[in-house]
Design a protein with these regions (language model features):
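C-terminal lid/capping helical subdomain adjacent to the catalytic/cofactor pocket in oxidative enzymes
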Residues: 223, 230-235, 257-271, 280, ...
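Dinucleotide-binding Rossmann-like beta1-alpha1 core, especially the glycine-rich loop
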Residues: 55-132
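Short alpha-helical segment within the catalytic ATP-binding CA
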Residues: 22
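Beta1/beta-strand and adjacent pyrophosphate-binding region of the FAD-binding site
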Residues: 4-19, 36
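Active-site/ligand-binding neighborhood in enzyme catalytic cores
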Residues: 97-102, 107-241
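Glycine-rich FAD pyrophosphate-binding loop
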Residues: 12, 25-54
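Short, well-ordered alpha-helices that flank and scaffold nucleotide-derived cofactor binding pockets
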Residues: 25, 29, 214, 380-383, ...
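Mid-domain catalytic core of redox enzymes
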Residues: 30, 224-350
């Protein structure tokens, strides 16, 4: 990162999450372009940012657990330019009716929940009986697909109430695609992710993100709201395209209405014990528990000998609808939202053509994107839209479906 000697830039990036930083880093390192990154928060990195809890020195993911995983060779090669990764493999347990169950859906959960051993074939037959004749491919909402995937008893115990808490929306009103991220296996493999590559940055997310932004041609302005400085910055760099990764509806001043987002609240505690729950993440699936899960961050880095033996940090996570002044995290994506999104995409396409603005990232495209997906999307947008603008002189145009 540099302080900069001039106010003229070749490219402006709004937001410093993985999408924005990937675009900025590639423009600087691959094209030699001078880039300004404008960030509303006091730190870079978006929701992936992490910091040490001062009393214990335990690294805490400030906006909830972030686990890096990908099967994309290009993405894995790219991120390894900026960070070394541990061999961490994510595993989750789920609390239901006072008992912690192995999760996600697999033979461990089935055998424990139903109180007897089922072989793979027996477990498949059991779930077939319990899916109520529903076909996952034909499901029209999350509840139908959930029952079709794991049967009604397991859906009711481990998905229904957790989903309602997480999204503040009835599962019958949520799209079926949301639950497609949930692994379903008929083995005792309890890894949460199936990807080829998985791990956590050895030195933490903050160090990784700062290295991405460290190129001498990149300037970062923190604590800066784009809408307060847009006219000034674009006036000083009138030819510079903008890559906007903030909320899509906010960019257009909610002209088509407010898209449905959810936000998260976090309750952090330092406890006088060396281990609170014995695992990094415990989901709380019952409706009478207000939080969705508890993170215990020491377990993400068991290799760190400097962590204290007599203290630990836990964070309870609560999910709710985002109100007007809240930070928005995830799109709810109801049918009404999807209709509104179509209209916003038309506005985005016009803005791209007329004012050289590209919309990207989770917030800028109203999509649920894991970290590797945001990075992969940014690399694609850079190759097919940013590079072609600077190298071939092609006009800026918004990617289809974004």
């Amino acid at each position: 990162m540099t302080s900069g000697d001039t106010n003229t830039y070749d490219l402006i990036v709004v937001g410093s999450g993985f999408f924005g930083l990937t675009i900025a880093e590639q423009a600087a390192s691959e094209l030699g372009k001078r880039v300004l990154v404008v960030e509303k928060r006091e730190h870079i990195g978006g929701n992936a940012y992490s910091e040490k809890e001062p009393e214990t020195g335990i690294e805490v993911h400030k906006y909830g657990a972030h686990l890096f995983h990908t099967s994309n060779d290009r993405v894995w090669e790219y991120v390894n330019r900026f960070a070394e990764f541990t061999d961490y493999q994510h595993r989750v347990f789920a609390m239901h009716d006072g008992t912690a169950y192995q999760f996600p859906m697999g033979l461990g959960l089935i055998n424990q929940f139903f109180g007897k051993y089922y072989s793979p074939d027996e477990a498949k037959a059991l779930i077939e009986e319990q899916r109520e004749g529903l076909d996952p491919a034909a499901a029209t909402n999350l509840e139908e697909r959930g029952i079709a995937l794991i049967g009604k008893p397991l859906y009711d115990a481990f998905v229904k109430h957790y989903t309602a808490k997480q999204w503040q929306t009835d599962p019958t009103d949520l799209p079926p695609e949301i639950i497609s991220r949930l692994p379903v296996r008929y083995t005792f493999n309890n890894r949460y992710f199936n990807d080829k590559y998985e791990g956590l940055p050895v030195d933490g997310y903050a160090a990784w993100l700062e290295k991405m932004a460290s190129h001498e041609l990149i300037d970062v302005h923190l604590d800066t709201d784009w809408f307060d400085v847009r006219d000034t910055i674009r006036g000083e760099s009138p030819e510079a395209p903008v890559v906007y990764t903030g909320p899509l509806d906010r960019y257009f001043d909610y002209a088509e209405g407010r898209l449905g987002w959810r936000t998260l609240d976090f309750e952090q505690e330092v406890l006088d014990t060396g281990d609170f729950q014995g695992t990094p993440v415990m989901n709380y699936n019952d409706a009478d528990v207000p939080y969705t899960r508890i993170h215990e961050f020491r377990h993400f880095h068991p290799e760190r000998a400097e962590y204290p033996d007599d203290k630990t940090v836990i964070v309870k996570e609560y999910s709710r609808f985002a109100e007007d002044d809240d930070e928005v995290y995830y799109p709810i994506n109801t049918p009404e939202d999807r209709e509104m999104l179509k209209r916003y995409r038309e506005l985005a396409a016009a803005e791209s053509r007329e004012n050289k603005v590209l919309f990207g990232g989770r917030l800028g495209t109203y999509q649920y994107l894991d970290m590797h997906m945001a990075i992969g999307a940014a690399l694609s947008v850079f190759d097919n839209h940013v590079r072609t603008y600077f190298v071939d002189g092609k006009p800026i145009d918004q990617p289809r479906g974004h």
